[in-house]
């Protein structure tokens, strides 16, 4: 199992990937809002990969603004707080789009909730056409429905655009561990895992709905450190970084 893309005669890497970015990464350190320097750095990484020939679609979380489940714990209605989180993802999408355009990369934001003044509606075939033309497509507003995470959105969008793999860029962690490496210095990192191992061990790769969706459709997941320079390019090229989750639990 591999995420390695093909090289064409001109030496460029070919392949279509769905990149899932955590909203917390956009804040530059787990705070609230958007850190322009961090978003610009991410945009530069994506731009380099697109120039090298890959087709990239993006789903961004909204945790740097709102988390529906956490707001629910503070007494808010879950559905309403989830919608607030969806709107937060759109703010992140627009920030990334702005910096991609500054890098000379055409991009389109498509949202699951209609907001015609700032984004296109989510239309899968149109998204694929954009990708084929070398544009980055950024999917916002989650699934457009409460109770679905942006991890699940990323898996669903990846399948619908026929992506080769789901690349999950994490903030501050370089793969999947058997326990939290931030609190346990003895935590062991996995090089690869099967979908079943992730589910039975209850490893915090993504929510179980997303993992099950990937398992049922044999979509590989690569979990890696987002903010390490050059890591998005390494992920697309199939280099051994992070943790690869797939059918066999092996990179062979």
Swiss-Prot record:
- Keyword hit for Repressor: no
**Region span, Involved in allosteric activation by GTP:** 28-33
EC number of this enzyme = 2.7.4.22
Domain of life per record:
Bacteria
| Assigned keywords, A-Z | Allosteric enzyme, ATP-binding, Cytoplasm, Kinase, Nucleotide-binding, Pyrimidine biosynthesis, Transferase
SUPFAM superfamilies linked to this entry: Carbamate kinase-like
Write down the CDD domains for this protein, in alphabetical order. AAK_UMPK-PyrH-Ec
Name the enzyme's class.
transferase
- What's any GO biological process attached to this entry? 'de novo' CTP biosynthetic process
Assembly, in brief, is: Homohexamer.
Q: Which family does it belong to?
A: Belongs to the UMP kinase family.
Known role: Catalyzes the reversible phosphorylation of UMP to UDP.
Task: Quote the record's binding site residues for ATP.
Answer: 20-23, 63, 67, 171, 177, 180
Q: Name one GO molecular function term.
A: UMP kinase activity
Locate the residues binding UMP: 62, 82, 143-150
Q: What is this protein called?
A: Uridylate kinase
| A Pfam cross-reference name | AA_kinase
Catalysed conversion reaction? UMP + ATP = UDP + ADP
Cellular compartments annotated: Cytoplasm
Which pathway does this chain act in?
Pyrimidine metabolism; CTP biosynthesis via de novo pathway; UDP from UMP (UMPK route): step 1/1
An example of a Gene Ontology cellular component annotation for this protein is:
cytoplasm
- State what inhibits or activates this protein: Allosterically activated by GTP. Inhibited by UTP.
Under the heading NCBIfam families, the entry gives: pyrH_bact
